[in-house]
Structure formats: structure tokens, C-alpha cells
Amino acid sequence: MNAPDESGESSWPVLAARVGALLPLTSLDPSAISFLQGDGLQGTWFSACSGGADSVLSTLLAFAHFPGRSGAFTVAHFNHCLRGDASSGDEAFVHRLAEGLGVSFTSARGMGTTGDEASLREERLAFLSKVTNGHQTAIILQGHQRDDIAETFLWRLARGAGLAGLAAPRPVRRSGNMVFVRPLLTISREEVRRVLGSVGATWREDDSNTSPIYLRNRLRMGTLEAWRKDSDREVGAGTVRSRRL
């Protein structure tokens, strides 16, 4: 979906309140919320936002449920510069989202060279490491949702992973001064989009997420869909339970 017009963008706090009402803290990952309400209050918060539905919802929920953090809250966007004007549009959209919420914004741009999934991830992590440098504790909010658990399981299983690797993504993960927190792991990709759409919030669609070049996309669109079709129960809920065992 494209970015909202100016009137829609000026109402981001209203949209945040609406999604917060639809998704109370009790509907989010309990481990993530427990951390945010406890030790997480001592850190500086950064919302890693691509402009996609998942990270937009994560940003709005953080704003809605933790209003006291708005003065120490930064929306962080990394532009890989792989999709020309579309990439620039993503960055501009996220910048307007941050401005509309009245919080800080920081961004950086990559070299625009096509890389594999691991290389692109390393670029984003290097960016986050740089912007959080100097903070004793930096809380990085990410938009991973329930479907990502099944995708990651298949992806890592194919590469060979132990129990810890197969249980990723975790709701809370520490790395140096950064703590990655994923409150949406109880929410499906479909519900993320349904909630945003129901309140009139929009987001950006990244065409590369459907490109067969990337293994994760092939697993999502092919293997995982076949698994869902052939399974006698809901795959997403099952993988969440398995991860917790």
C-alpha cells in the first residue's frame, strides 16, 4: 500500500491509539512485554521500521502502550537503495511516520548493490550498532510476527541448526548493548494487515519480498503454503507452541 495523504499522516497518534485498543498488551508476546515493562524502561528505545506493515504496527503499538517513552524513542530506518524510487519512498514514508508521532528519526543508506539475505541483514545490524553506539542499553523494537517463526524454522532447518537456532526468533535477545525485542510474535501476518486496515493505517509494500531470488521468500510462498494446506491444524500456532517447549 502507498503512504497516506497529508491528512492521514497528521493523524498517526490517533491511528496508534486505535491499534492499541484493538491489540492490548495482553495480546502481545508476554516475554517481550514483561521485559519492556521492567528492565526495558531503563534503556533508550529504537523502533527498526522498514515501512512495511509489521514494523509500522510495532511502532504504533509502542507509541500507544508506552507513551512515557516518546521522549526517548527513535524510529530507525535503513535504506538498502535496491529499488530506486520505491526505496526512497519507503524512507520518506517512515520519516513522515516519525514526524507525525512527534518522535526522533534516524536513517542511513546502503551502497545499492544487490546482496544475499545474510549480507543485507548484516548491513542493517551494522546500522543499528552505529546509531545505538554510546547508549548503555538500547532497546531495538522489531516487527517480527508469528508467521516468521515458521519461516525461520524451515530456513534454519535446511541449513542445519541446533535447538536454540530452531527456536528463533526469540521475543527478547541481547547482543552487546542492544536488546532486540519482538512483541508481535503472537500476531499473524494476516492479523497485522487486518488491524492496520481496519483503522485506516497504511504501509509500504516491498516487491522484493515476493522475489524468488531469496530462499526465505521461496519458503514462505511455496513450502510454507503447502505445509499449511496439508496440515490438519494451524501451523503458526503449532510452531509457536513448539518453540516454547
For every predicted segment, state its role:
Residues 214-245:
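ATP/NTP-dependent adenylation/nucleotidyl-transfer catalytic domains that generate, transfer
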Residues 2-221:
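Core alpha/beta nucleotide-donor-binding catalytic domains of modification enzymes
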